[in-house]
């Protein structure tokens, strides 16, 4: 009988530990470089998968107006939840807008090249103007990670292409953080 109680206690203790570990993961985002971590006091509120394009325009270089390059204009993507349901869109600003009409704009705070040299960088953004009562209305920070594609064309552009626009397919995961309740 002592063994059964001890075994039961061990099982109960193990179960409690597992529940504790699982609970500690709730509200946490992905493993990212230190400079891309959400600030203390914020918890993960929503994760969204983005599929769309990064839009570039052939324009005079900001550092040398006699040279031309592909300059980033805006993103254009649909946002999906983990079940594949469309939950919103991502567009210039940068802005994320939910189907519930809440939205948030972001401002880049930090960046990291990420593990894929052929993909756009990973970012941490500060929320500038969250609005609405929905999923994005309380957002304070946004992470862009797990990027695929989206980089400006490697071949560059010249004056003869000035004003031309190219749309480069990309995918990314966005994590939205709100204040800890």
Q: What is each of the regions a protein language model found here?
A:
Residues 12-16:
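Alpha-helical transmembrane segments
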Residues 1-11:
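Bacterial N-terminal signal peptides that target proteins for export
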Residues 19-20:
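C-terminal motif of bacterial Sec signal peptides marking the signal peptidase cleavage site
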Residues 26-55, 62-181:
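Primary mode marks residue(s) on the alpha4-beta5-alpha5 output face of response regulator receiver
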Residues 23:
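Short, conserved catalytic or interaction motifs in soluble domains
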């Amino acid at each position: 009988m002592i063994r059964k109680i001890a075994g039961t206690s061990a099982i109960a203790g193990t179960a409690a530990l597992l529940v504790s570990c699982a609970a500690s993961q709730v509200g946490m985002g992905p493993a990212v470089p230190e400079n891309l971590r959400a600030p203390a006091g914020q918890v993960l509120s929503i994760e969204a998968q983005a599929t769309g394009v990064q839009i570039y325009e052939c324009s005079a270089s900001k550092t040398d107006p006699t040279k031309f390059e592909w300059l980033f204009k805006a993103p254009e993507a649909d946002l999906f939840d983990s079940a594949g349901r469309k939950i919103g869109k991502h567009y210039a600003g940068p802005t994320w807008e939910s189907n519930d009409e809440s939205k948030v704009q972001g401002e880049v705070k930090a960046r990291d090249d990420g593990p894929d040299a052929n993909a756009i960088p990973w970012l941490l953004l500060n929320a500038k103007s969250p609005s609405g009562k929905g999923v994005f209305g309380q957002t304070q920070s946004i992470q862009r990670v797990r990027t695929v594609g989206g980089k400006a064309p490697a071949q560059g552009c010249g004056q003869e292409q000035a004003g031309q626009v190219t749309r480069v397919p990309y995918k990314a995961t966005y994590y939205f953080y709100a204040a800890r309740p």
